[in-house]
């Protein structure tokens, strides 16, 4: 279907704040979901997308956690439904051909799948899911995404049949949904980052208390940081870990569980990313300074040819006088220090290959040997 609203592309890429997300949700719920809007835009409780975006849900840590949990559950259910996990993709299309309430829902899904913003909607939805999903569960999301083309193909016939409908309401709905998910992703990232760090610090304090009570040194699960040089060693130790050894550890101490490992790894990656971003400009400046010094240390080719010509003409005694150096400064445009350094390095490079110098060294050795024998 055509994108009737001709909404600017930038609107789908920007991220709203918490207040802006609430305004967008209210506008979509009040202006779009009223009257004769399609069934997929109306909910019995009057909420928009079943997401809690009011100020009450974020006024306290418990409210934020409840909102995040409810939103994650709704997002998981949505992905399961759109990816065909809810069952009956073909059944829904068949029911749509026959008519009824299921037919209206199937047609609405077909319109969403055929909308130009569907790919951005799916990407924003999956991005929210990936934030709070454990690392070992991420392949399940990828497996469901692999089925998306099949879902689109199932509803393509219905989308072609509904192409003549007015899509302004759907345009507005899709735009608000994408913007809201982008804003919600930022909130989820902040929520997970803060509470994950608090969880790691709490585990570290528990292990410190255990050490003070029992005298046992803290195990691998401490909150101590590690340098980049120790990452490979830590990864190798993690690969040697046998989960069966945790069977007798009923008190929760000792080696961390798989979920704790996943949480700590996520926090460590987040901190490493923030450090790289914080020092990115300084690292670039240092790199440019090193490259500039390297370029400054190399002399131009025409100047070195002049110095090499003087070297070859004075191969028996390659030590220029002050007058020779002054003349070379005028001819090459180099500084006196650069010329001195070049001759020093050139003599080192050609010390053993210079026949005159090797002959003089042999003569000195023979004379010294004769004096010692006498």
UniProtKB/Swiss-Prot annotation:
InterPro entries found in the cross-reference section: ELK_dom, HD, Homeodomain-like_sf, KN_HD, KNOX1, KNOX2, TALE_homeobox
SMART domains: ELK (SM01188), HOX (SM00389), KNOX1 (SM01255), KNOX2 (SM01256)
Alphabetical keyword list: DNA-binding, Homeobox, Nucleus, Transcription, Transcription regulation
GO BP annotations listed: regulation of DNA-templated transcription
Region (Disordered) residue spans: 214-242, 347-374
The keyword Transferase belongs to this UniProt entry's keyword annotation: no
Protein name: Homeobox protein knotted-1-like 13
Provenance organism: Oryza sativa subsp. japonica
Gene: OSH45
